[in-house]
A protein has these predicted regions:
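Internal nucleotide-binding/catalytic subdomain
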Residues: 1-45
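Active-site "cap" helix and flanking loop/linker of ATP-utilizing ligase/carboxylase catalytic domains
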Residues: 19-38, 53-102
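Peripheral (often C-terminal) accessory segments that flank ATP-dependent C-N-forming ligase machineries
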Residues: 77-157
Length: 157
């Protein structure tokens, strides 16, 4: 869905991943990029570039919980001409999902229920996202989708 990200993309093999990384490095070199950039590629044709995001990335939250060094820290390191940090991931998968709610609602009750149900869930109050890391994709999907549905009021348990 548009409200869910899975990192790394399921089904992507190491050759495809390496091709995308090399393309990104080539683009960065061609334009003299200093800092970080997010490249969005087509899920069906990974060589088809959909968007280049120079500012706050759409998928930046996943890196805060799923990567040794997150997007924002990497950007700061690059701008300050410091060595970049490890891009190693913490688990096999990181899932994030946007949360839909009334902007005037009290988030305390949903957070209390969801955090008690699964302490592994991580919430970003600013971007209204939930995230979780692990190795079982099906279980992670179930957790994130349940959280989104509960938070939005679609379900009440």
């Amino acid at each position: 869905t548009d409200n869910l990200t899975i990192t790394p993309a399921p089904g992507m093999n190491s050759e495809q991943s390496q091709d995308i990384q090399l393309s990104a490095l080539k683009l960065a070199d061609e334009i003299g990029l200093i800092g970080a950039v997010e490249l969005l590629v087509d899920a069906n044709d990974y060589k088809k570039l959909i968007d280049v995001n120079w500012l706050a990335p759409n998928s930046g939250y996943w890196s805060q919980i799923g990567s040794k060094t997150n997007f924002y820290e990497q950007n700061l390191r690059a701008v300050l001409d410091l060595p970049l940090g490890s891009t190693e991931i913490n688990s096999q998968f990181t899932l994030t999902g946007r949360l839909s709610t009334d902007p005037t609602s009290d988030d305390y009750r949903p957070y209390l229920h969801l955090m008690a149900r699964n302490p592994e869930l991580k919430f970003n109050q600013v971007s209204k996202e939930v995230g979780i890391t692990g190795d079982n994709l099906e279980e992670l999907l179930t957790e994130v989708i349940h959280t989104q549905q509960y938070y939005s009021g679609e379900i009440n348990e």
